[in-house]
From Swiss-Prot:
It comes from Xylella fastidiosa (strain M12). The gene is ispH. The active site is at E126 (proton donor). (2E)-4-hydroxy-3-methylbut-2-enyl diphosphate binds at H41, H74, H124, T169, S227, S228, N229, S271. It comes from the Bacteria. This is 4-hydroxy-3-methylbut-2-enyl diphosphate reductase.
Length: 316
């Protein structure tokens, strides 16, 4: 049984930045430090930060007045930002810069009075934050959410000739392309972003899984069940005709999965650390793996700057 590692896999620049923001804030200011929502969608990462002193909450009313709060990588609505300011909270923003780009795009279309369509998954925190950039006090029009082609067919917009779209950053590239095609067919004058809003890491990891699926008869995706990009990786492998499972850690591997399997692919979502992948490889060796090799893959060199207040050199 041979194991093939996807490349790239695991942490992206936005996740690296978000985790480092929490760690540095704790180091510089001490505890307690509050984090609104899981800073990234990975149980191992969140548990590690809890042990360091981070307190995770879902809403700002759980944060004491005047305390320090970090916004997660998924971003927050304008209403949350206003509430934080009104309550005198000290805020560090771990929103991924690629999500911020989408937020700015939505705000720009709001100011021009266009209607806006967001392609995304209802209930996901990134979608809630992006929908919340639409400020009725600063513009007219409306923002609509579509999740699939059927939603596009059923959609009724107030301004079909004054319309734009954007997307959640962690979607299936293939699904999103099909939805955009449906939007353009129904609304020929719709405006889109200059560049694809699917993030580079999402695109690269999906391309890598597609390569794995061509060579493997099983693909294991390391990632938490609430991770959008991790779920998309497992779904993509299945669409390519390969059995695939999303696992939080090596402990979730069922030995029955690898029976009669000759080539097992392993990848990790953008919020899953390498230490979890290492644990999966160790478990696969216990189950009979004889070798591990790695695809050459697409190099990633993206680095996002920390907030200015956290760039100061820490002094022991």
């Amino acid at each position: 049984m041979k194991v093939l590692l996807a490349n790239p896999r695991g942490f992206c620049a936005g996740v690296d930045r978000a985790i480092e923001i929490v760690k540095r804030t704790i180091d510089m200011l001490g505890t307690p430090i509050y984090v609104r929502h899981e800073v990234v969608h990975n149980r191992f990462v969140v548990d590690d930060l809890k042990q360091r002193g981070a307190i995770f909450v879902e809403e700002l009313h759980q944060v004491p007045d005047g305390a320090t709060v970090i916004f997660s990588a998924h971003g927050v609505s304008q209403a949350v930002r206003r509430q934080a300011a009104q309550r005198g909270l000290k805020v560090f923003d771990a929103t991924c810069p690629l999500v911020t780009k989408v937020h700015l795009d939505v705000a720009r279309h709001c100011r021009t009075g266009r209607d806006m369509i967001l392609i995304g998954h209802a209930g996901h925190p990134e979608v809630e934050g992006t929908m919340g950039q639409w400020d009725q006090e600063r513009g007219t029009g409306r923002i609509y959410l579509v999740e699939n082609i059927d939603d596009v067919a059923a959609l009724h917009v107030a301004q079909p000739h004054h319309l734009a779209y954007t997307t959640q950053t962690t979607l299936s590239v293939d699904d999103t392309r099909n939805i955009i095609d449906a939007l353009r067919q129904r609304f020929p004058t719709i405006q889109g972003p200059k560049n694809n809003d699917i993030c580079y890491a999402t695109q690269n990891r999906q391309d890598a899984v597609r390569e794995l699926a061509r060579e493997c008869d099983l693909v294991l995706v390391v990632g938490s069940p609430n991770s959008s990009n991790s779920n998309r990786l497992s779904e993509l492998a299945q669409r390519e005709g390969v059995a695939s499972y999303l696992i939080d850690s090596a402990a979730e591997i069922d030995p029955a999965w690898v029976i009669d399997k000759h080539h097992i692919g392993v990848t990790a979502g953008a919020s899953a650390p390498q230490v979890l992948v290492d644990g999966v490889l160790a478990r696969l060796y216990e189950l009979g793996a004889t070798s591990v090799s790695e695809h050459s893959g697409k190099p990633e060199s993206m680095v996002f700057a920390l907030p200015k207040a956290l760039r100061l050199q820490l002094v022991d």
